[in-house]
Amino acid sequence: MKKGHLRGVVLAFFLLVFIQITPIFAQNWEIGTTLGGSLYNGDIDVTAATAGNEIRFSGGIFVRYHVNNWFGLRIQANAGTLFADEKHFGTSEWKTKRGYSFSSPIYEIAILPQVHPFRLGSFEPFVFLGLAGASFDPTTQYNEPNPTADLEPDIQQRIALDKAAIFSRTTLAIPLGGGVQWFVNDRFAVGAEFGGRKTFSDYLDKIHASSGGSANDFYFFGGLTLSYFFGGGNGFSGDWSGSGGNRGGGVSCPKF
């Protein structure tokens, strides 16, 4: 067989294989977007009662691959803003005098393995635990013109150290959270989710020396999701997992 003919046969073979396997893999893919809010927790004493003052808009996009009827793997990109202001809290006199506030963009790329323990009708809860990389760049403000007035010399010195601090503006983070999806039909789903991120940085807020502690900072993303399922859909009306697991209506438990 001539080389040109052989090349054509090989190309046709791989094209045929690609056409045959694409629906098998495509039916397990989901793409979506999130809209919601981002929230910070760290050296400024954000509390549940006052957290509403600190929530800022966030959004993201994700791609999720459903390995089987109980386990999936999601890659997600999020963007939001972290904000806190000590005037909202007043937990101690010296912090009120310090009058610190900060704002920082937060960008995240996360890999999120997730478990879907069961489906109840058209609703399906899930939990996730993963690994993320985040970047941030805090802008800070103290009481002006003299933020250290009437403060102890030691506190004044620590505030000066924080102002002059040199630190990395990237960090690894461990996302942990959960949510629920509602399957509108076999192509679309809407949902809600919330997750916290434990970071390995104490500088999301650019406070470290004057914090009075050594714990690293946290941030949170939460909101509503809208997603679309490729190929065979999400199985709302039948089997979609590609592994024999039925994720149709009713209560469905994991099959191993």
Where on the chain are the PLM-derived regions?
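Outer-membrane beta-barrel proteins
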Residues: T22, L39, V67-N69, Q114-R119, ...
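Extracellular loop and loop/strand-boundary signature of outer-membrane beta-barrel proteins
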Residues: D43-A49, W94-S101, L161-I166, H208-G213
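Residues on the lipid-exposed face of transmembrane beta-strands in outer-membrane beta-barrel proteins
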Residues: T33-L35, G59-Y65, I111-V115, L129-G133, ...
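Short glycine/proline- and aromatic-enriched beta-strand/turn motifs that initiate or cap beta-hairpins
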Residues: F25-H66, S227, G231, K255-F256
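Gram-negative (and chloroplast) outer-membrane scaffold detector with strong preference
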Residues: Y65-P153, S227-Y228
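Membrane-spanning beta-strand positions in outer-membrane beta-barrel proteins
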Residues: E30, G72, S122-E124, P175, ...
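Predominantly the C-terminal beta-signal and adjacent terminal strand-loop region
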Residues: N185-F256
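Residues that define the transmembrane beta-barrel architecture of outer-membrane proteins
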Residues: Q27, N53-F57, S103-I109, F123, ...
